[in-house]
Amino acid sequence: MKRIESATAGQAGRLFDIMVRATELGCAAFYPPEVISIWHKGRSVEGMAGVIAQGGVYVLIDEQAVRGFVHFKDSEIVGLFVHPDDQRKGYGTELFRFAVGKMPVRPILIKATLNAIPFYAKLGCRKVRTESVRRHEHDIYVVRMKLS
């Protein structure tokens, strides 16, 4: 049975693995390998546990396994990741709709990787602008999207 619930510190390793695997595989056609490795530089399971402790991180569990997670704060989706083995099963859509339902303020903002644009567009989000995020002296291009 599927359910969405608050993430726990004990799930930090699984969430970190999902994030790394999803970005390595999902972003490979859109970003060079060195950019993807920079993205992960300095991130850790301990860091993920710290994010979970701050709240706003929810996991989707199906068949007793974490399949993906969403992290949101105020009216912004900070991250939404589904394990590559579990993509195209509707988990990302469920996590997105759950997060939107929890956010009291509109518009909702999303900072999306280039590969995620079609996913968010399908859910009614529109592109606002392309921007760069500076990480370890490199610019990583992402798209700011909005759901009104």
Name each model-derived stretch.
Residues V20-E46:
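Conserved GNAT-fold acetyl-CoA-binding loop/helix
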Residues I77-Q87:
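A short, internal acetyl-CoA/4′-phosphopantetheine-binding micro-motif in the GNAT/acyltransferase core
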Residues G55-G68:
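Conserved beta-hairpin
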Residues A121-E131:
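Conserved acetyl-CoA-binding loop of GNAT-fold acetyltransferases
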Residues R88-G101:
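Conserved acetyl-CoA-binding loop-helix of GNAT-fold acetyltransferases
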Residues K111-P118, E131-S148:
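C-terminal "cap" of GNAT-fold acetyltransferases
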Residues V70-S75:
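A conserved beta-strand-loop-helix scaffold within acyl/acetyltransferase catalytic domains
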Residues K2-D17:
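A short beta-loop-alpha structural element at the N-terminal edge
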